[in-house]
Amino acid sequence: VLARTQRITRGIDYRSIVRRGSRRAGALHVVHVIDTGESRPPRFGFIVSKAVGNAVTRNTVRRRLKAICLEATPRLRPGADVVIRAFPASAEAAYADLRHDVVRGLERKAAA
C-alpha cells in the first residue's frame, strides 16, 4: 500500500503533471513525470478511465499499478511526481507484461 505521503490526491496536481510533465508512452500506459526537486519520496497518481472496463476491472488495474510503483520506488528520484494513465489494453494484460511496461517507462523518465 502506498503511504499517504506517496500519493497525489489533488486534482490541480494531476493537471499540472499531465500538462507540464515529460511523458513516455508504453503499449499499456503513459507515464507523466515532473521532478519537483524536493527531498521526499516520489509521489504517484493513477488515471484509469471507464474505457478500461467496469469498476472491478478498473480497480484491479489500479491495484496492480500501485503494487508495481511501490516495488519501483527505491529506484526513482526523490521528489519525482508520477502520474500513470492506463490504456484499455492494460485490463487484459498479464501482470508480468504490465510490470515490464511500467518499470521500463519509470526507469526512462524518473530513475535516480
Where do the PLM segments sit?
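Positively charged, solvent-exposed patches that mediate nucleic-acid binding
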Residues: 1-112
